[in-house]
Amino acid sequence: MVESTFEPNITTKSVGQAIRAHLRVLKLTKKPSREEFLTIAKVAGAGILAVGAIGFIIYVLLTMLPQWVSQ
């Protein structure tokens, strides 16, 4: 059986620890350069287009294939 990891006893100490952990991560981050941002945007856009193209191909096959088989 899976044990619940829910922690019902939220204290100010645990909230403070969580905030400190998040702040530590935020201090390590940096704003991406324009070139880095554009590269990430291009890769993400290409991925979205690829998934959309695959979905469209599946849609066309599922709508046209029954017509071809029944003829």
UniProtKB/Swiss-Prot annotation:
Q: Which InterPro entries match?
A: Prot_translocase_SecE_dom_sf (IPR023391), Translocase_Sec61-g (IPR008158), Translocase_SecE/Sec61-g (IPR001901)
Any idea which UniProt keywords this protein has?
Cell membrane, Membrane, Protein transport, Translocation, Transmembrane, Transmembrane helix, Transport
In the UniProt record, does the keyword Zinc occur?
no
Q: Where in or outside the cell?
A: Cell membrane
TM regions (residue ranges)? 43-63
A Gene Ontology molecular function term for this protein is: protein transmembrane transporter activity
Cysteine pairs bridged by disulfides in the record: none
What's a BP term from Gene Ontology annotated to this protein?
protein targeting
Q: Which domain of life is it from?
A: Archaea
Q: Which GO terms describe its cellular component?
A: plasma membrane
**Topology within the bilayer:** Single-pass membrane protein
Q: Which family does it belong to?
A: Belongs to the SecE/SEC61-gamma family.
Assembly mode: Component of the Sec protein translocase complex. Heterotrimer consisting of SecY (alpha), SecG (beta) and SecE (gamma) subunits. The heterotrimers can form oligomers, although 1 heterotrimer is thought to be able to translocate proteins. Interacts with the ribosome. May interact with SecDF, and other proteins may be involved.
Functional description taken from the UniProt entry: Essential subunit of the Sec protein translocation channel SecYEG. Clamps together the 2 halves of SecY. May contact the channel plug during translocation.
Q: What is this protein called?
A: Protein translocase subunit SecE
Source species of the chain = Methanosarcina acetivorans (strain ATCC 35395 / DSM 2834 / JCM 12185 / C2A)
